[in-house]
Amino acid sequence: MKRFVIGIGGVTNGGKTTLAKSLQKHLPNCSVISQDDFFKPESEIDIDENGFLQYDVLEALNMEKMMSAVSCWMENPGSSAGPAALESAQGVPILIIEGFLLFNYKPLDTIWNRSYFLTVPYEECKRRRSTRVYEPPDPPGYFDGHVWPMYLKHRQEMSSITWDIVYLDGTRSEEDLFSQVYEDVKQELEKQNGL
């Protein structure tokens, strides 16, 4: 059975979840898996020499559990959308996986049909992050001492990636980002379906 898997990665507060949810509303037979749903409990998160909880690393995530969810979807891709969606014009089940460390996790490397990465400049990212409420809350200095440096490190690691990633400017409007990605996905689905 054909499947279409979209990866939406990027910086914290870059618009990944918003974009994924917008696409899910408009794409037939579409499911979303969010990497944020797979954080380990706080008691299992390492603390660095500055006293910061190390949430921005793969080890803070239960990636085996996430991969299990991805595998379940791959084995039974239409199950969450219902029978009407299976008869949609597109026909191809779509999975969107969104998260901040998708493209740094090797077991996912071979599943992407399309990959997108949202970027936001430092000041805007810091501003957006300051408006969000986290549990546990970000301690003073956490963004500059941990979050941003880890983003830069992970982004650098991505330089060895051999597949195409479309980089998106996360400061553009939600509507613009949605339109660009939606049209791109539509074209790719048409190619896959031979239309």
Swiss-Prot record:
Q: Where is the active site?
A: D36
EC number(s) stated in the UniProt entry for this protein: 2.7.1.22, 2.7.1.173
Recorded GO MF terms: ATP binding; metal ion binding; nicotinate riboside kinase activity; ribosylnicotinamide kinase activity; ribosylnicotinate kinase activity
Query: Where does this protein hold substrate?
Result: D36, D37, F38, F39, Y55, D56, R129, Y134, E135
Question: Matching InterPro entries, A to Z?
Answer: P-loop_NTPase
Q: Which GO terms describe its biological process?
A: NAD biosynthetic process via the salvage pathway; NADP biosynthetic process
Q: Which Pfam families has this protein been placed in?
A: AAA_18
Residues binding Mg(2+), per UniProt: T17, D36
Identify which top EC class this enzyme belongs to. transferase
The pathway where this protein functions is: Cofactor biosynthesis; NAD(+) biosynthesis
| Tagged with keyword Cytoplasm | no
Annotated ATP binding sites? 10-18, 128, 132-134, 172-174
Q: Which PANTHER family match?
A: URIDINE KINASE
Name of the protein described by the UniProt record? Nicotinamide riboside kinase 1
Q: What is this organism's lineage?
A: Eukaryota, Metazoa, Chordata, Craniata, Vertebrata
